[in-house]
């Protein structure tokens, strides 16, 4: 049977591994190294990948692409993309669909297309070692990658000629690698993954269940725009400023100089993990009318730490949230695993040790662990390994917009995947012929403050009073974390569905910002939710009372009718403002005004149905206890033609 390889498609470096028997082999590339730079260059009609691309980067900066993973599945207008444009020598452009693409030699290319070149290199490396064709692979992504980015990664695999059998999260893969050599018994581990472009932390429970190792992800958090590249940029900015002070010359306008600076900064950063100081010496970095200029700067480890301390501190908040979501304290963690090349920095190791109260393990190779874990999962999927069970989670809440602009979650964050959940909603207007389902991802209770992933229409709903149609919305997330959403009219059986596509995903910064905003604005969100609820209650009460008034017209005096209409008018005005208590008071006033009429109706034997306004409007109209009032956009079929 053909092997399923494991690929760590990294921002800075990539790695490929395969399981042979009960051992995992990390495969050396043609250059003899176990990791390959994630760099692609276009030169004289030739495509260079890996070390050969890196070697010529200084002389060909505009056509040498690196850190493409930071663009995958993103929109051009995202703030993080705009920030990147000023930091890289190659050209980032806006595609026709609004995505961030790159342009080389007047040709626009999508990030998955470029990432496919790296995957092809990994595929060829594995084929050369195994001596056979390879088509199946497990590819890793940051745990906090959104639906768009996961889909784009699968697309890259397809372009590379690979059948991506599974997309798995990098920290989870690292835990699989750690579990290979671990002693039997149950344990809870924290995987701290600071790579070239992304940061993730996952809390994972490893249990022995009838001789099978079960890896259950309890929670995950992260920042998908924080990694080693940002540490490099901090050092580059410092070197540029030092040169400007000394020579009164800004190197940022010179792509060739910036490429040399990038290489020197990366080299200096690595050296300072073992040395106390290093020298950056770049002769002939540039020239002006006075002649050539040279850059010579000595950097100490303490200087590098001062420049990057804020970046390291940014990793701690996600760690706190991950522990909180898992319902654990730092002292409950048995082992801390460091993954990603940036974790070799002494300041990172010290910060992690201080937070978790224990020294991180050093026996897991931070550059190779993710590929090793992917290879293990590949062996599980191909049936070569049967004693491992992996249970992963989705990182953010998924839901739809309901009445009052509220985000109604259908699948909560840190829900185990694959999963499928449904909820029944209804219409907001009488005889509403169609609804628009708006799908959001995020932690805010205000739908508009989350990210709109996509929307679709369910049409041809038979005429019915509002609240009567039963519209079942189903979210289905597969093991790759990729979503399908459907809406079904339970009355007619008519169904419409959508797969969230790569051009409608979240930007990395938005995801991280959503969770942070949700925590910082929890009180504000609660206030909004309460206001939306009381407005919905007022709307439902008015609708039901007006209907009851019309039905019992012959039993109501003009004075009673006038009193109720005045109370309705007062409530409608109050509902337009943001005073929760005032709306509540006007609601009670309406109830009191309607009370004599409801007593007459009851006495006349018309039953409790006419007095429905005394009950919650949602309950009065819903045929199912799980029905939620939803404010759907009405679709005018004539406008669509």
UniProtKB/Swiss-Prot annotation:
Molecular functions per Gene Ontology: ATP binding; ATP-dependent protein folding chaperone; unfolded protein binding
Domain of life according to the entry: Bacteria
Factors inducing expression: By stress conditions e.g. heat shock.
Amino acid composition bias (Low complexity), ranges on this chain: 605-621
Region (Disordered): 605-626
Pfam families in the record: HSP70 (PF00012)
Keywords, sorted A to Z: ATP-binding, Chaperone, Nucleotide-binding, Phosphoprotein, Stress response
PTM annotation (Phosphothreonine): residues: 198
HAMAP family the record matches: DnaK
PANTHER family: HEAT SHOCK PROTEIN 70KDA
Entry's family note: Belongs to the heat shock protein 70 family.
Cited function: Acts as a chaperone.
Name assigned to this protein: Chaperone protein DnaK
């Amino acid at each position: 049977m053909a092997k399923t390889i494991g690929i760590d498609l990294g921002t800075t470096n990539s790695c490929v591994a395969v399981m042979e028997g009960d051992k995992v082999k990390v495969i050396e590339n043609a250059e003899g190294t176990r990791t390959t730079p994630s760099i692609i260059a276009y030169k004289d009609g030739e495509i260079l990948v890996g070390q050969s691309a890196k070697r010529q980067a200084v002389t060909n900066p505009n056509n040498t692409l690196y850190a493409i993973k930071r663009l995958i599945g993103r929109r051009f207008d995202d703030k993080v993309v705009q920030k990147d444009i000023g930091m890289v020598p190659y050209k980032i452009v806006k595609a026709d669909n609004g995505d961030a693409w790159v342009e080389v030699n007047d040709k626009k290319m999508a990030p998955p297309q470029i990432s496919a070149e790296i995957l092809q290199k990994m595929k060829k490396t594995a084929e050369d070692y195994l001596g056979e064709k390879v088509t199946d692979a497990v590819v890793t992504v940051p745990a906090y990658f959104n639906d768009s980015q996961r889909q784009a990664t699968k697309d890259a695999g397809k372009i590379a000629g690979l059948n991506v059998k599974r997309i798995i999260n990098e920290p989870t893969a690292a835990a699989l690698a750690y579990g290979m050599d671990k002693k039997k018994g149950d344990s809870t581990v924290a995987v701290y993954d600071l790579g070239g472009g992304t940061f993730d932390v996952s809390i994972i429970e490893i249990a022995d269940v009838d001789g099978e190792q079960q890896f259950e992800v309890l929670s995950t958090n992260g920042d998908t725009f924080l990694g080693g590249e940002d540490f490099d940029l901090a050092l580059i900015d410092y070197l540029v400023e030092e040169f400007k002070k000394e020579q009164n010359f800004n190197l940022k306008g010179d792509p060739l100089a910036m490429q040399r600076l990038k290489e020197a900064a990366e080299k200096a950063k690595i050296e300072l993990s073992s040395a106390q100081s290093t020298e950056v010496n770049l002769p002939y970095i540039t020239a002006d009318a006075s002649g050539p200029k040279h850059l010579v700067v000595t950097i100490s480890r303490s200087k590098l730490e001062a420049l990057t301390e804020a970046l390291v501190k940014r990793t701690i908040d996600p760690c706190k949230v991950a522990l909180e979501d898992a319902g654990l304290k730092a002292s409950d963690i048995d082992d801390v695993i460091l993954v990603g090349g940036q974790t070799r920095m002494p300041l990172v190791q010290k910060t992690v040790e201080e937070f978790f109260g224990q020294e991180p393990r050093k026996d897991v190779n931070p550059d190779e662990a993710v590929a090793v874990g992917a290879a293990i999962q590949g062996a599980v999927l191909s049936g070569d390994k049967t004693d491992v069970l992996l249970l992963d989670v989705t990182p953010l809440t998924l839901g739809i917009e309901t009445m009052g602009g509220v985000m109604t979650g259908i699948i909560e964050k840190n829900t185990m995947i694959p999963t499928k959940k449904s909820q029944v909603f209804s219409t907001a207007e009488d005889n509403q012929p169609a609804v628009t389902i708006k799908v959001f991802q995020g932690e805010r209770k205000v739908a508009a403050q989350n990210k709109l992933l996509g929307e679709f229409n369910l049409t041809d709903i038979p005429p019915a009073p509002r609240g009567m149609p039963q519209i079942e919305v189903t979210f289905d997330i597969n093991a790759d974390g990729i979503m399908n959403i459907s809406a079904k009219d339970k009355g007619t059986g008519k169904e419409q569905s959508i797969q969230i596509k790569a051009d409608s995903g979240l930007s990395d910064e938005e995801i991280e910002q959503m969770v942070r905003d949700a925590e910082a604005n929890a009180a504000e969100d609660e206030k909004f939710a309460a206001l939306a609820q009381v407005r919905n209650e007022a709307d439902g009460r008015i609708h039901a009372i007006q209907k009851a008034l019309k039905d019992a017209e012959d039993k109501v005096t003009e004075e009673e009718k006038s009193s109720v209409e005045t109370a309705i008018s007062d409530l409608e005005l109050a509902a337009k403002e943001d005073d929760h208590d005032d709306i509540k008071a006007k609601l009670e006033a309406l109830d009191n005004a309607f009370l004599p009429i409801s007593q007459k109706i009851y006495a006349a034997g018309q039953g409790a149905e006419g007095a429905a306004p005394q009950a919650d409007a949602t309950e009065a109209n819903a045929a199912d206890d799980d029905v939620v009032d939803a404010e759907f956009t009405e679709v005018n079929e004539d406008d669509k033609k």
